[in-house]
Amino acid sequence: MESRKKFSALAALIGIVCANGAYACTGITLKSKDNGVVTARTIEWGESEMENMYTIVPRGYIQQSMLPNGDTGGLTFSSMYGYVGLAVVQPGWVVDGMNEAGLSAGLFYFPGYGQYPEYNPSDAARTISDFQLVSWILSRFSTVDQVRAAINNIRVTSIDPRASTAHWRVTDASGAQIIIEITNGRANVYDSKLGVLTNSPDYPWQLRNLNNYVNLIPGTAGPVQFGPITLRAFGAGSGFLGLPGDFTPPSRFVRAAFLQNYSIQQDTSYDSAMQAFHILNNFDVPLGTEYAPGRAPVNMPSATQWTIATDMHDKVVYYNTMYNRTLRSIDLNKIDFANIAFQSHPLDTVRAETIIPVQINGAPTNR
């Protein structure tokens, strides 16, 4: 009875979140000169704070998937690899993270285009909820080829019919990356050589749409003779004139692709992780911009709830949040995944920016 009550509460919450809100996720991938790979992404939800937390999962930890209607007996899996993930709503719903083998995985909303297989109670033992798929991937695999081989052995479902479907990005330490989209009840696995992912439409469509922007170039367009007058750019950056700036998934995909592709390659994976946060600043969604007039979310500083970068070379997870833009890090090398206990903690212990006063020479220090 207690587990069914828990299911009902979680299903209601995630159903409301996915059905009624505006959500926007933007992901990029950077590779450094030292052969390091960094994946980074934002997560947006502008209705309310999503109970964001980080979760540490040890080796050998056993999880069982939730199922529709509060059914029990979902896919049970034990962690071959320890991992760290950023979760929403409850600790097992890891949205993005990395395991000790350097495999990164993330969930991105995919409304209107995904179609999971119809839930069949007779297949409960190999059925997993979409919000637990990242945990399954991080706990069981070290390469994208392993994930590719296993993904169609399970059945992915949503615990609430109102919820949006999702698609997933998986990257390993070699830089290999795949996108998983479930349509017509079957997983389609795409090699992702570009490294960018947002939301709907489907990934092949997003790639084709890039062809609309073949005219964009980095830098400044040169002067053009226009009859008797000479046309000149007003300022730097005119080569990107026409780059989409709105918050729709296709526009964010194009913008992320161009900013990622033309950003300067960094020397180290650490530098790439720092660069990723600068790039993703372009995708912060100011609170209220995705809503109709009069529908104003309250008690939140931003619709971009958090941003994460996973450094698969150094095995460090970095994040900041809407409450505190100061970067925090979790070094997987310093975690004994054989002995640490499963645990989960809020991303912010204090919901306030870290502001460091500048001490002015000669000014009083007691203020």
Model-identified regions with their sequence ranges:
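Aromatic- and glycine-enriched pocket-lining scaffold segments that form the walls
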Residues: 144, 148-182
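Bacterial N-terminal signal peptides that target proteins for export
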Residues: 1-10
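Compact, glycine/acidic-enriched structural inserts
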Residues: 55-71, 114-154, 341-351
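Structural recognition of the beta-strand scaffold that forms the well-ordered cores
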Residues: 38-40, 104-107, 169, 179, ...
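Sec/Tat signal peptide C-region and signal peptidase I cleavage site
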Residues: 18-24
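C-terminus-biased signal that marks the final domain/tail of proteins
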Residues: 24-38, 46, 52, 150, ...
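Short helix/loop capping segments that flank catalytic or ligand/cofactor-binding pockets
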Residues: 48-49, 115-116, 178-181, 188-192, ...
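A contiguous strand-loop segment
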Residues: 26-122, 162
